[in-house]
């Protein structure tokens, strides 16, 4: 989740400075970090050098993570987190390769597990605050398969066909599928230029509204379960789309809910900042440093600032 991940950052030594800060830092002996014959290094000096935004972000994150752990530790299953890690290890070709990839991002296996646990706490928080019904999930999701004939964006492209040829081929495939829809998967495996889904008989899994090309989405959500579309043009090429029966809806429901919550937060960051504010109030959070409080309120808990940051920054770190 992009906006949440922007707040789940490694806490640097700058957070430790707050322990030495009162309402304002002065150059008194109590605020001296290092002394020498050449002069002292104070909390105020160091905070000025590091920057209050970074200190506020780090300290807020540390505090937030402690609160979330206290509130949701009994709801997060470590076994599921271990299963996530095992899945990632397989994707990277084994434990050693996975841990090497982590090291390249400055992470250890333990730190990565801690990050997954923190992300799980955030999911629990948002699940508490943002209610989504089963009917809403069904309304906003559709299980689908497709056959794609790619259109070349330029003549030198190795993949795809010219627009006219691609359309003609897609129309021929659509006629073949319409004669016997039960062969959709077999034909998708043979003809689709989307190699990822072609290996799975064209299966895309569940598609959410707002997740894909608008023309593709419009055509898909018009279909009844089991129906096959006419040829649909999108920014990728020409598709034949099949609406699959959601026989596994109950097992996929929680994952779909989390994705819909993420979409809602992306569209309306106030949902996230309000959830944080409620949490701070519940735990009687008191900012001892006025400057830190100002940064947290004006930037971190400001939905407009968070939205700008989410648009400019991407999700860093390894995929889950």
Swiss-Prot record:
Could you provide one GO biological process annotation from this protein's UniProt record?
protein folding
Look up keyword Secreted and say if it applies.
Answer: no
SUPFAM superfamilies for the chain: FKBP-like, Triger factor/SurA peptide-binding domain-like
Q: Give the catalytic activity.
A: [protein]-peptidylproline (omega=180) = [protein]-peptidylproline (omega=0)
Q: How does it sit in the membrane?
A: Lipid-anchor
Q: What residue range is the signal peptide?
A: 1-20
Compartmental location = Cell membrane
Presence of keyword Cell wall biogenesis/degradation: no
Enzyme class, UniProt record, top EC level: isomerase
Question: Where is this protein primarily located?
Answer: membrane
Database matches in PROSITE patterns: PPIC_PPIASE_2, PROKAR_LIPOPROTEIN
Which residue stretches, if any, does this entry annotate as coiled coil?
none
Per its UniProt entry, which superkingdom is the organism in?
Bacteria
Q: Where is this region: Disordered?
A: 159-198
Gene Ontology molecular function? peptidyl-prolyl cis-trans isomerase activity
Lipid-modified sites (S-diacylglycerol cysteine): 21
EC numbers, comma separated:
5.2.1.8
Lipid positions (N-palmitoyl cysteine): 21
Annotated ranges, domain PpiC = 139-245
Q: Which GO terms describe its cellular component?
A: plasma membrane
Q: Which UniProt keywords apply?
A: Cell membrane, Isomerase, Lipoprotein, Membrane, Palmitate, Rotamase, Signal
Q: What InterPro entries does the record tag this protein with?
A: Foldase_PrsA (IPR023059), PPIase_dom_sf (IPR046357), PPIase_PpiC (IPR000297), PrsA_foldase (IPR050245), Trigger_fact/SurA_dom_sf (IPR027304)
Family the UniProt entry places it in: Belongs to the PrsA family.
* Role, per record: Plays a major role in protein secretion by helping the post-translocational extracellular folding of several secreted proteins.
Name the HAMAP family for this protein.
Answer: Foldase_PrsA
Q: What is this protein called?
A: Foldase protein PrsA
